């Protein structure tokens, strides 16, 4: 076979293999596949626990969370503090009634726990991935990747409890320094949509929430911010 044709055929075969890998780590995944990352480290009384030598790190984490709450108070009308508990209670019903700072602490400590015992393995996670081109590039680079988008699988819809649970499980399965990428839908935020969304500084750009697409955009923004904050907080250790 001619040299160039052979090279092309090999390239096509490699692309087929990568595409299969991509489907396996994107469209085919669901929350049930990551349940090994669901448990939270707890003691015999069911209380969240961690090694004594983590005490300073957990204290530092909670200080950072309190500073974030101050920012939320000043610039977002306490949006995160009002909305995030609703989302987290949907994903983890046992959290119902917990203070938000304890919910967030639990999620971060759980990630630290899985990293410390060697269970974490994801090096790249792409949320709202669309066609997952970034994850395809990650696989091509030899990284262990996962991607989710409701266009690939209805179970990836983060506005439903299983989808949000999956997103948080994926975050928990990441190694230190993993890439966390969000392609959050922004159609209701663009200038061309302003006449319909009615987003402005006067309403903190929340717009007319009586319209479904605006409310959906706001909720997706809330969840995106939650994932970003958790991703940053997990870097306080390791």
Feature map (PLM): residue ranges:
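Short Cys/His-based metal-binding microdomains
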Residues: 1, 6
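Conserved active-site and SAM-binding loop architecture
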Residues: 8, 12-238
């Amino acid at each position: 076979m001619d040299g160039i044709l052979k090279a092309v055929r090999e390239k096509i075969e490699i692309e087929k293999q990568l595409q299969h890998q991509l489907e396996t780590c994107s469209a085919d995944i669901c929350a049930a596949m990551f349940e090994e990352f669901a448990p939270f480290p707890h003691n015999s009384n069911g209380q969240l626990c961690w090694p004594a030598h983590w005490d300073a790190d957990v204290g530092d984490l909670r200080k950072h969370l309190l500073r974030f709450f101050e920012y939320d108070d000043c610039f977002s009308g306490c949006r995160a503090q009002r909305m995030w508990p609703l989302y987290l209670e949907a994903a983890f019903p046992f959290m119902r009634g917990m203070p938000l700072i304890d919910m967030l602490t639990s999620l971060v400590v759980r990630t630290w726990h899985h990293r410390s015992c060697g269970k974490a393995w994801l090096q790249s996670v792409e949320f709202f991935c669309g066609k997952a081109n970034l994850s395809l590039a990650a696989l091509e680079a030899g990284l262990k990747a996962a991607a989710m988008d409701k266009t690939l699988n209805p179970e990836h819809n983060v506005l439903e409890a299983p989808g949000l649970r999956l997103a948080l499980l994926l975050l928990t399965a990441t190694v230190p320094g993993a890439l966390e990428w969000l392609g959050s839908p922004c159609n209701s935020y663009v200038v061309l949509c302003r006449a319909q969304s009615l987003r402005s500084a006067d309403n903190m750009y929340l717009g007319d929430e009586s319209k479904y697409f605006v409310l959906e955009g706001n909720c997706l923004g809330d969840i995106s911010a939650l994932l970003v904050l958790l991703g940053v907080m997990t870097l306080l250790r390791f």
